[in-house]
């Protein structure tokens, strides 16, 4: 089979399963509204959970940062790309989340890959929730360590896997809020079992940070756990992009030596770090509290109105509200019908989610209004 034949076969298989991914160019894709092809849609597909992507203070901070530092960092943080703006953001994040150190990364994917590949060796074992994000599972699969997956949120299964002999160290990997189901991990129980077997815990809280907990401190703070490795991202609750790893002084120094994604990547622009500092200030403020309260009310309104639809509603109290349809074609058809009626919704299909669980992944944001939720419910009931 030639290269072209290999490529064609893979694409044909995706088309046959109604699983071919496509991108849609949009004029505006974050916040309450999505604009595409000169039409405005209510946006139920973005992860801008607090509606901060268009916040004037954050935009102003980015502009001022660009004027001060330029539009790029100029290199890796190990060369010339680590600015006082990066340093200030790291210090503020560490203080906010109760860690000694924070290290910035250009994306959550890069942060997860960097940590897992740097921390584990051949004699070690990674025990990951089966529904962990692709960045976590891919890194674990590519690492020299042994990978074992436990049934989603099943602490008893996790304990059995940890109890089997391992010549090296064990790293337990999970998420705070799961990206496709919107449910939360039982972090306190997971941490307890991990500690009983002398392992370390790594939590990716991409979808919880900024959105839940006191001052938006996220899933771990809310559940009173302190994992050895906490990954937070800035493309969701923060409304920007990028990520950080929270850890001890020793682990931070170790990652600075061995995390190749950190060492060999151009660091985020200092102007972006300034924007993230402004976003963090909003998240920690009374305004941040108000946005979280509004989002919670919108979620309650949606869940109350969707109960009698002929879909499976995931057990989620987060901004991620999946309606599980099952069939790929049906999910695509529903998404298209909703778009025709002014609601931009995305169909998520395998391999992103398990086979037979194609869904409409609905996401709510504090930028929405109650009438937006009512309109979504009206359209869903008309197409259920």
Curated annotation (Swiss-Prot):
<comment type="subunit">
    <text>Homodimer.</text>
</comment>
<comment type="function">
    <text>Catalyzes the decarboxylative condensation of pimeloyl-[acyl-carrier protein] and L-alanine to produce 8-amino-7-oxononanoate (AON), [acyl-carrier protein], and carbon dioxide.</text>
</comment>
<dbReference type="InterPro" id="IPR004839">
    <property type="entry name" value="Aminotransferase_I/II_large"/>
</dbReference>
<dbReference type="InterPro" id="IPR004723">
    <property type="entry name" value="AONS_Archaea/Proteobacteria"/>
</dbReference>
<dbReference type="Pfam" id="PF00155">
    <property type="entry name" value="Aminotran_1_2"/>
</dbReference>
<feature type="binding site">
    <location>
        <position position="133"/>
    </location>
    <ligand>
        <name>substrate</name>
    </ligand>
</feature>
<dbReference type="InterPro" id="IPR022834">
    <property type="entry name" value="AONS_Proteobacteria"/>
</dbReference>
<comment type="pathway">
    <text>Cofactor biosynthesis; biotin biosynthesis.</text>
</comment>
<feature type="binding site">
    <location>
        <begin position="108"/>
        <end position="109"/>
    </location>
    <ligand>
        <name>pyridoxal 5'-phosphate</name>
    </ligand>
</feature>
<feature type="binding site">
    <location>
        <position position="352"/>
    </location>
    <ligand>
        <name>substrate</name>
    </ligand>
</feature>
<dbReference type="GO" id="GO:0008710">
    <property type="term" value="F:8-amino-7-oxononanoate synthase activity"/>
</dbReference>
<keyword id="KW-0093">Biotin biosynthesis</keyword>
<feature type="modified residue" description="N6-(pyridoxal phosphate)lysine">
    <location>
        <position position="236"/>
    </location>
</feature>
<dbReference type="InterPro" id="IPR015422">
    <property type="entry name" value="PyrdxlP-dep_Trfase_small"/>
</dbReference>
<feature type="binding site">
    <location>
        <position position="207"/>
    </location>
    <ligand>
        <name>pyridoxal 5'-phosphate</name>
    </ligand>
</feature>
<keyword id="KW-0663">Pyridoxal phosphate</keyword>
<dbReference type="GO" id="GO:0030170">
    <property type="term" value="F:pyridoxal phosphate binding"/>
</dbReference>
<dbReference type="GO" id="GO:0009102">
    <property type="term" value="P:biotin biosynthetic process"/>
</dbReference>
<comment type="similarity">
    <text>Belongs to the class-II pyridoxal-phosphate-dependent aminotransferase family. BioF subfamily.</text>
</comment>
<feature type="binding site">
    <location>
        <position position="179"/>
    </location>
    <ligand>
        <name>pyridoxal 5'-phosphate</name>
    </ligand>
</feature>
<keyword id="KW-0808">Transferase</keyword>
<dbReference type="InterPro" id="IPR001917">
    <property type="entry name" value="Aminotrans_II_pyridoxalP_BS"/>
</dbReference>
<dbReference type="InterPro" id="IPR015424">
    <property type="entry name" value="PyrdxlP-dep_Trfase"/>
</dbReference>
<dbReference type="InterPro" id="IPR015421">
    <property type="entry name" value="PyrdxlP-dep_Trfase_major"/>
</dbReference>
<feature type="binding site">
    <location>
        <position position="21"/>
    </location>
    <ligand>
        <name>substrate</name>
    </ligand>
</feature>
<feature type="binding site">
    <location>
        <position position="233"/>
    </location>
    <ligand>
        <name>pyridoxal 5'-phosphate</name>
    </ligand>
</feature>
<dbReference type="InterPro" id="IPR050087">
    <property type="entry name" value="AON_synthase_class-II"/>
</dbReference>
<protein>
    <recommendedName>
        <fullName>8-amino-7-oxononanoate synthase</fullName>
        <ecNumber>2.3.1.47</ecNumber>
    </recommendedName>
</protein>
